[in-house]
Amino acid sequence: MDVNELLARYEARGQEHDFVAAKPLFERAIAEAEDARLLTGYGYLLESHGRNELRQAVGLYERAIELDPDDDKPHYHLIGARAGLREPERAVALYEQRLAASPESLREYRFLGHAYLTAHDYTRALEIAEAGLTLAPDDAVLIAVRGEAKAGLGDAEGALSDWARALELDPEDIGALSSSAFLLERENRLEESAAAWQAIIDWNQARSQTLETEWPKRELERLHAELAGRTGDQ
């Protein structure tokens, strides 16, 4: 059976043994003679496999929520997985229903805010964050969500201000600091972005989280190289 037939079977049936059989055949053929059609076919095989894996992950997160309704983590993973499947509207619909059923629940505002963000509906994310903040004005999660919404709407200074406030309220969650680092780079404020990455490294090192420093160190090295290149061009 050739790679094209295996790819067609895997697309139609989603059976793992067809993926396992097709993958090395594609890799061998590409190594022998790189070809645009082979690369496209192999890419699509991997993409299809990724979608199937994500669908399994969705089922696991949904089951985890059933088993432990008070754990927030699987909710956020579920929202992210739906976005990865290009189905963010399904997460939005779910958490709109949940909030409607529990309009005084702060966590439901948080979930729905994140769902709107993954759907790139920044206006609604901003609205839901502000609505939740009427219940708890100093909720770090919703302030961070509001920051993400502002960033999506082009309000960089408002986003940075919200993320700084979120970090002040909850120093043990540095997600807002990562968001700041990326936004500052997009705004071409590379020195400030580098400072944010250094702060992330320092935060992890202070907690003996060595592995967690590897990625921010790579980001910092990349920024330093870009800054050095700019200096050399002057």
What are the roles of these predicted feature ranges?
Residues M1-V3, A194-Q234:
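Terminal, low-structured helical/coil segments at or just beyond the last alpha-helical repeat
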Residues E11, Y44-L46, G80, H114, ...:
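Residue-level recognition of tetratricopeptide repeat
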Residues Q15-P24, H49-R63, L85-Q97, A119-A131, ...:
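Structural signature of tandem alpha-helical TPR/SEL1-like repeats
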Residues I30-A31, I65, L99, L133, ...:
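A conserved position within tetratricopeptide repeats
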Residues A33-E34, P69, P103, P137, ...:
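Short coil turns that delineate tetratricopeptide repeat
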Residues L38-L39, P74, E108, L142, ...:
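TPR alpha-solenoid repeat register
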Residues G41-Y42, H77, F111, V145, ...:
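Canonical tetratricopeptide repeat
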Residues E168, I174, S178, F182-S208:
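TPR/TPR-like (Sel1-like) alpha-helical repeat modules
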